[in-house]
Amino acid sequence: MGIRFYKPYTPGTRNRSMAEFDQITETKPEKHLTSWIPRSKGRNNRGIITSRHRGGGHKRLYRNIDFKRNKLGILGQVATIEYDPNRNARIAKVHYQDGEKRYILYPRGLQLGQTILSNFNAPITIGNSLPLHQIPLGTEIHNIELKPGSGGQLARAAGSVAQLVAKEGNFVTLRLPSGEIRLVSKSCWATIGQVGNVEQMNLTVGKAGKSRWLGRRPKVRGVVMNPVDHPHGGGEGRAPIGRSRPVTPWGRPALGQRTRNATKYSRNLIIRRRK
């Protein structure tokens, strides 16, 4: 996948870059593998905003992705590589020998027509899925489960890759894309390889309108608000925040303050914090 840069025909194209779609082989999704999911717009079940700066954006059909990879012992052939508006990674449609079709995350280097397999003794090749205790040390993996049978939750974004660095007892040690090193049950499953579309991190939006297409609303700085709206607000002209450290709109410490719950059960599974 390459990156397309634009000449400054307009202010919006001056700094814009976007991914090329030369890898995409199909433009329309498989109908029975899609569903319509109402968009939350950052609201909870009571209509209260729980995640700010969300709303609007282009309509989307949700693609049902197979994160569990639980079709054991049945070979599947990669039929298409498709765009998914719900994530920055590409997806691949797999035709299995029993006639079923499923979407999976597209790993980097997977070719059309290539066969993949999910099994306890599957070969260590790109796209295959197997338990962590069956994967050799140093192997690059993605779509990793946190609990056996729950489906992949770690290393799913474009270009993400984790590495298996140790095995001991009932756990294996993983180096995650964030730099965190943590323990995961050896019975959890993972997929071999790196998630595709690795150039995603180098793209620039270019204009505010594209953020609106993606469902991202504007972010207003607290320092330009009134005191009734934000602790940083108020003052005469361009005044400083008037505090020893920045805080959230609700007065909690922000920008660098650790907010992870110290009593969370998984604290003992984290060997080194993320960077």
Curated annotation (Swiss-Prot):
Q: Its principal location?
A: plastid
Q: Which GO terms describe its cellular component?
A: chloroplast; mitochondrial large ribosomal subunit
Query: SUPFAM superfamilies, alphabetically?
Result: Nucleic acid-binding proteins, Translation proteins SH3-like domain
Q: Where in the cell is it found?
A: Plastid, Chloroplast
Q: Work out whether the entry's keyword set contains Transmembrane.
A: no
Q: Which Pfam families match?
A: Ribosomal_L2, Ribosomal_L2_C
Disulfide pattern: none
Family the UniProt entry places it in: Belongs to the universal ribosomal protein uL2 family.
Q: Note the subunit structure.
A: Part of the 50S ribosomal subunit.
- From the Swiss-Prot or TrEMBL record, give the protein name: Large ribosomal subunit protein uL2c
